Amino acid sequence: RKIPDSMDFKAAAGFAMVYTTSYYALKQRAQLQPGETLLVLGASGGVGLAAVELGKLMGARVIAAASSDEKLDFVKHLNPDEVINYSVDELKEKVKMLTAGRGADVIYDPVGGDLFDQCCRCINWNGRLLVIGFTSGRIPEYKANLALLKGSSMVGVFLGRFRKEEPLEYENNFQQLLNMYDEGKLNPIVTKSFPMEDFVAAFNVFTERKVMGKVTLEIKAE
């Protein structure tokens, strides 16, 4: 796909995967509606930032959650309605407090592990729990009795399969995202760029879980 004239290479590197993943998750999988409460875990990462940004554009009340105040400060330029530091606050109780006990309507979870377990207990009636990934390292188990009691759904988000099975819908999503970018509604953020020869340092930023926004590798022209 040709990069639009309005988009530079760094923005393009931080655009396609994160925005198409988050848009597919919120639009097709969760069918997010205006006025619903969207909880985004890992909100300072690439897909998390995109989910916060798109959630606001879709008219949701967005709660951005991350593991440090530094990461939450980074997210605040997107104007989430509420923020949660889940290294300090218990996620389940904080979400319930912010939603008058109801819980979130849609939960965007790229983290998994213990946070997923808490999400199952702070989701609203008819809620949708989006499984994006497992950056915590632990693939959690879903308690079927909680789905029954809350009328909730666990919904998988696999962009590669979506692109293969529904290519026209994928392309339609991509074009809508490009239109949003051209209209100044989306702002892909690349916070660190490394020359290709420093790829180990770039990889360490990920393994140490210090990433905010996107990290790119630059290939010099011969």
Model-identified regions with their sequence ranges:
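Mid-domain Rossmann-like dinucleotide-binding core that forms the NAD(H)/NADP(H) cofactor-binding site
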Residues: 13-89
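C-terminal capping/lid region of NAD(P)-dependent oxidoreductase domains
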Residues: 178, 183-192, 200-222
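Short SAM/SAH-binding signature in class I
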Residues: 102-108, 127-128
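Glycine-rich phosphate-binding loop and adjacent beta-alpha segment
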Residues: 114-185, 218-222
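Short helix-loop-beta connector
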Residues: 5-8, 31-37, 101-102
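Local beta-strand N-terminus motif with an aromatic residue
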Residues: 35, 80, 103-104, 186, ...
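Short amphipathic alpha-helix with an adjacent loop that forms part of the alpha/beta core around
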Residues: 90-101
